[in-house]
């Protein structure tokens, strides 16, 4: 008798995606982050659902409803901090996942990669709107500053900003719609993740060498299910260490002050995972130029498929490209540090140099290094 998992219409889909899926035998722990992102998304949806049961999206009561969750709701504090720090874990996994894709040339899977870039944008939008919901000082001023960037768009900018605000400033209408979008977007992200997997399973996974693995593949279960469970346990352990020992480590103290439109905080900055993009935005004196650089800093990921000049897919056997990749990682860490610093000397010039280096590395140095690598191998 044929196994039900191979014949049942629903079980068959799960079987082909997670059980009998042929996977390369040599994929390393860098391939764990896809499943970890799935774990993070489920965790965020569940904790978010329980928070939404007690949260009120109204300027008068939003801040006190978050306080109520932490003080009066059974285990409300742990749900709240798991959700807040879960977002940080989500972005750590996202950056690792994207970094692995860049290093091993996964961007040559065009559809999978571009759906991934859309997923990154959707996740960033969700995180930004979620940060606005507690209605603390940094929530309010962060929402004001970031939405105001759209006013840099010629002709329609001001109208667009007021349309998003639902008035002439960030107020009740803005908070209500941000809550609505913050609630619906994770489900859209989940649907996009399925599309992402669908395209991935059309081609099969990439491997560290970047060459076809058709000759040497193993079933996904039990080998990679066990590996993914280990990764998930380590992720949850790391998250719980953060939640139980230093829940406010990655947050901003200003967000424990209720939002006040009449009092601007001395340093307005987003959450740590947006600081690299914020530093690029701030390093350009022109408003429209800054906004374009901000968008391009993420959108540039889609260009990798066009500017890949190497005859090899992975960086595994390309030492010059490897060196440039790690310089890029160091540059992004520098930008993250600069984004959290005040706008004064020497941070301004460091930010500008790091921003120039970021775009130069991706658009000029990496393609040149790949061409040099080809010539050295006489290809």
UniProtKB/Swiss-Prot annotation:
Chain positions recorded as heme b b562 binding sites: 83, 182
Note: Heme 1 (or BL or b562) is low-potential and absorbs at about 562 nm, and heme 2 (or BH or b566) is high-potential and absorbs at about 566 nm.
UniProt name for this protein: Cytochrome b
InterPro entries: Cyt_b/b6_C, Cyt_b/b6_C_sf, Cyt_b/b6_N, Cytb/b6-like_sf, Cytochrome_b, Cytochrome_b_C_euk/bac, Cytochrome_b_N_euk/bac, Di-haem_cyt_TM
Cofactor or coenzyme needed: heme b
Keyword Endoplasmic reticulum on entry: no
Any one Gene Ontology cellular component term annotated for this protein: mitochondrial inner membrane
Keywords from the named record: Electron transport, Heme, Iron, Membrane, Metal-binding, Mitochondrion, Mitochondrion inner membrane, Respiratory chain, Transmembrane, Transmembrane helix, Transport, Ubiquinone
Record's cofactor remark: Binds 2 heme b groups non-covalently.
Localization per Swiss-Prot or TrEMBL: Mitochondrion inner membrane
Binding site for a ubiquinone: 201
Main location: mitochondrion
One GO biological process term: mitochondrial electron transport, ubiquinol to cytochrome c
Assembly: The cytochrome bc1 complex contains 11 subunits: 3 respiratory subunits (MT-CYB, CYC1 and UQCRFS1), 2 core proteins (UQCRC1 and UQCRC2) and 6 low-molecular weight proteins (UQCRH/QCR6, UQCRB/QCR7, UQCRQ/QCR8, UQCR10/QCR9, UQCR11/QCR10 and a cleavage product of UQCRFS1). This cytochrome bc1 complex then forms a dimer.
UniProt membrane topology term: Multi-pass membrane protein
Signal peptide: none
Top-rank taxon, per record: Eukaryota
Lineage per the UniProt record: Eukaryota, Metazoa, Chordata, Craniata, Vertebrata
Pfam family, one: Cytochrom_B_C
TM annotation in the entry: 33-53, 77-98, 113-133, 178-198, 226-246, 288-308, 320-340, 347-367
Family the UniProt entry places it in: Belongs to the cytochrome b family.
GO molecular function: metal ion binding; ubiquinol-cytochrome-c reductase activity
